[in-house]
Amino acid sequence: MTCTKDARLQLGREALQAAPTLLVPAVLLGGVLGLGLGLWLGCRASHLRARLQKDDRKRLLGSSEPPAQSLRDTGSQAKARRRQRETTRDEDAPEVCEPSLSGNITAFALKARVVYPINQKFRPLADGSSHPSLHENLTQAAAILPHLPHQPAEASPASSLGSLSQAGKEDGSSSSSMRSTYSDDRILQCAFLRVGSFPEILACESVDIDLCVCSLHLKDLLQVDTALRQEKHLMFIQILKACLLDFFPKKKPDDELCQKVLSKQEHDLEELEKGLQARLANTEMLGTGDSGYVSLADVERKERELSEQLIDNMGAFWKQMESIQPTLMDQFKCSSSKARQFMMTLTGRMIVAEGLLHDSQDLHVLDTLERTMGRSHLARMVEFLRTQIQEETKCRLAAISRGLELLTVQGQLSGRQKEELLTQQHKAFWEEAERFGREFTQRGKDLVQASQARQAEAAAELTQTQEEERRSFLADSQLTSDPGEFLKAFHEVLERQRLTRSDQEGDEDTRITEAMAALCQELYCSTMGTFQKFVDSLFLKTLPEVTSLPVAECETLRQQVQEQAARQLGQADRFRRRQWGLLCDLLEQDKRVWLEEGTLSTVLQRQLRDHHESTIHGVLSRFSGLSEESSRGILQGHELLLCSALRRLALRGTTITALAQMRLSGKKRLLQELHEQLALEQGVSPCLEEHQWQLLRALEARIQEEAARLEDEAQQTGLRLQQQLLAEAQEAGRLLQLHMERVIGQALLVHARNVASKGRTREKEDFKRTLVETVVESVYVTSTSVNRLVQAHYQAVGKLLQAHEEQLLQRLKTLQGERINAYKLWKKQEFSDPSLESQTADGTHGASQGVQQRMLSQQKRLLDQFTKHQQGRLNSQRQKAQELDQLQAQLETQLQEAEQTLISELSTLARVPLPENKPFSNKRGLPEKPVRTKRKKPPPREREDLGTPNDDHLALADHTTGPLSTTYSASPPIRVHSGGRLDQQDSEAGDGESTSKILQKGSNL
């Protein structure tokens, strides 16, 4: 083994020895190959670098994600690119050509310069990590301080146009800044701080101002509804009291019965309000738990449940008003007609009160909107003042970093010394900034607590004063002098009290805002003084000791650093002014949206009113039997309920608008930040390179895209929430329909009872019964004479029925002919309509943009035709019903005349005197006819040959309907025995006492 190994080694060494003659050509060839290989590698590396830069530029131009928002220095970008190129050179070719996903993200993060808001809680760094801002505690800040000197210094709030990035794909979002696509689920689950008053927003940090202010807006709307509902209850009690004094003038205001009714109504209203407040409190606490945050989904669910409960409360108040009429009939023993008149008067005055409340609600909604816009403006102003210290810190640290960098370049300061000094300055400055935020929060909370205590005390005093003012007004006013003027005066008193409370709250909001601004200014001046001490200590004490520089040179360097910081702060101040201008424009745009939604809500209310009014008029037009008074009372009650329901829906529409704005707050914030970034990029430099112009155009395109998305999202959100409003409107309409069905049913029942009891007076029924008894026992009446009278009566009734049928058929044929002629005329006018011909002519052009308009016009035309056709059918049926009623009334009059003739002839035959003749009352309004009281003497042959009524007459009598059957049901039938005596079928003549009375009457006659 050893020999073999030695042999191989010796052989190898001999092979490695070069011949002297070939040494020079080999060296030359090696040099040429090495030079060629070096040139090839250099070209390869430069080609790869250019390719990577081109790919990065394409990715920047094609990026469609939300831009991140932080400022990076130009020098730091160059350093980052150099580090990236050094890393790229160390990698082999396949890895460079196909970098991994993490490598792409890291390279992109190193090359992108992004803009972050000054109040963001976490700022991503170039390596993907994040360091907290001054909102974090001191330990977290100290943990990252050693790494701060290695981060790029931020010289100014301006940057180049390499600021489009793909940040925003992260899920992390704070309450003040959300950075991702806002899907519905994510928006609804977004949690924000639960606030009970406006000062709490000013004292809290990292608060979403838009959502918190809108939540306060919802709370103010609920307070408006509560105040107006309480005023409605107060006015109802006063109106009821005035109506009692008007309809019962003998009753005094302090009468026991009146006080009993009023106290019962007041107690019922108090119980109704207590139950509502308990349900509202349960709904307010639903799903909240002990957390100080609330989600948008919880807010929408709470508002929906509140609306349902308020609608139920409205229905309960309607039922309470209905209970007044039976109470009057029971307690005051008044007639039903007087009770109906009382309710009509009460309803009319409540309609006036509802009109006053509706106008007041519109004014309060506008006032609440102005207050909300003002609160948003004040909160943004305090936020700007509070975050100004961060800009000061960043700009001063950036200027200090440049000054130390200058000393390092000059060789007067080593790199290690520069890093140590910069670390010390970062730590000192950020600790002072943290102290500023901590002290501002603590002292701000103290101011808020003092403000809330002061406001609660002032509100209690104001409530007591206003209560005494109301009592004094009610004691001095006269209810019965002029009810309309009294309602207006009482409403003005309550309206003035509400405005006073609102002004008091607004003044307190302004006062606490001024106090917070003064506190911020005080702390700002203190912090700036501390910063100046840090700078003086660094340049006048530390640097002369470390670098052995003269104090004069250090003073000059300090002045240069301060001038650099002043220039950067000036740029930051200009940017903040533009940012504030954009914010004011956004607030004005939001206000216009609110006003437009209010206008649409007014149009919706008008449409609902027209629909319900046309419906109730159509229903009442089908009931021709109702009296004018009943119809007027029904329409009056419907108007009152409709006004109340529409007022509730109007306030709910305002709530829907607020919820829609809360849903869109995230996208509006994103668009606002894009506008701010565009303003920042445009203010960097008037001279831009080609790729910078491309990036600027890409940013503008991104803004247009986000604006289009925001508009689409606003439309979709508005449609979804409007569907909820329409569903609640349908629920309120259903409640109104049930109430009106009950009222109309009661009116129809009263009408049916009146019709059934028409003409059936007690005196007339008693006379018929007495006449039958007398005829049965009379010796003057024979079967032959009775049969003759009955036969003549049946013949007369048969003629009347035959004439009635002929008239009925004739009228129906006439009405049918009139309807056919009217339909032909309507169709002829429809086909000759010039508007239809013009639409057809326009449609022949085939313009695609007019297809939708033609379809809409065709749909509208068909709906109009259907409406006209239905109205024509309704008019025809109404005319037919009127004709039938007229013929029926005429038949009833004739049958009653025939019945009166039979009674008079029978009483004459039985020697029974008729009661005093009263003019026959025709309740259908037909012409009256005199009643015959004398009997015509039949011919002698009829006296001799009298027979029973034939079968035709009996059949005719059996088939008589309506008034005829009721007429004969009142008088029992009479039959004849073989002995010639008459008997009563009901055997009433068997009663001895009755018989004796009848005989006594006969003897007296």
UniProtKB/Swiss-Prot annotation:
The keyword Membrane applies. Expressed in the developing skeleton and the orofacial region. Expression is general to all the cartilaginous components of the skeleton, including the chondrocranium, the vertebrae, the rib cage, and the axial skeleton by 15.5 dpc. Keywords: Cell membrane, Cell projection, Cilium, Cytoplasm, Cytoskeleton, Membrane, Transmembrane, Transmembrane helix. Its main location: membrane. The keyword Nuclease does not apply. It is found in: Cell membrane; Cytoplasm, Cytoskeleton, Cilium basal body; Cell projection, Cilium; Cell projection, Cilium membrane. GO terms for cellular component: ciliary basal body; ciliary membrane; cilium; cytoplasm; plasma membrane protein complex. PANTHER family: EVC COMPLEX MEMBER EVC, LIMBIN/ELLIS-VAN CREVELD PROTEIN. This is EvC complex member EVC. It comes from Mus musculus (Mouse).
